[in-house]
Amino acid sequence: MLHRALVLLLGCASLLAQQQTQTFKITPLKPVPQLRAEALKALPPAESGPFRQPDLTELVKLDPTIKLDIHYASDNNFMGTPFYTQARAFLQRPAAEALVRANARLHKQGYGLLIFDGYRPWYVTKMFWEGTPVADHLYVADPSKGSKHNRGCAVDLTLYDLRTGQPLDMPSSYDEMSERAHSDYAGGTALQNANRALLRSALEAEGFEVNPNEWWHFDYKDWRLYPIINVPFEELTPSTAKEP
């Protein structure tokens, strides 16, 4: 309850929450249709394995109280264009079940999880890398290595208040490419830093590790056990995406 007391005490800082709703933007190095065409023709890196059979599970079917705000299914993202045709979020089953446990843990404190992204087809990672200026490559995954999102073992998320349904204020907006996005950034307000710490503690308790460059990005501990996947949501088959 200490965290909620801090939220109430610092509620007067609500103007700072506007920073959370402002979408960070870049100017892609190439036109997005060109990036997409090139990425769809490219092949993911070869891997030797062995790997577990993919078992991508849709998060909201496992726990309907998990909320979605899939930025890459709209133009509300850092490139200003949709990358997905469906606003859905998947993780490998063990990671999905761990996330559900974290959500239940947070509910006891009056909060829930709001998902920005989960499994991400490899070609989208390729588009991000090729479209982002080299100076900002710290914030996008190298497609020659693949992203943990591509393995269904990374999730981008934040917290929302169960009473209001509104996301909590954090030190930066989602996908912001600046030091404010770093998980150890100390320049936020006391409230922002407390919110970030609450999210991190809940996820770490269930086997996730925060990305040092992105407070919202968490990798599941078993990510090495799964292969890179390059299948759009609408083409996922029962062998990769299963009902709970």
Model regions: which residues?
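Extracytoplasmic cell-surface/polysaccharide-interacting catalytic and binding patches
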Residues: Q18-G118, G131-N213, D222-P244
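Short, well-ordered surface patches within globular domains
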Residues: V124
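Structured alpha/beta reader/binder surfaces that contact nucleic acids or chromatin modification marks
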Residues: F128
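Bacterial N-terminal signal peptides
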Residues: R4-S14
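Conserved metal-phosphate-binding beta-hairpin within the catalytic cores
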Residues: F218
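Segments that shape or occlude catalytic/ligand-binding pockets
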Residues: P121
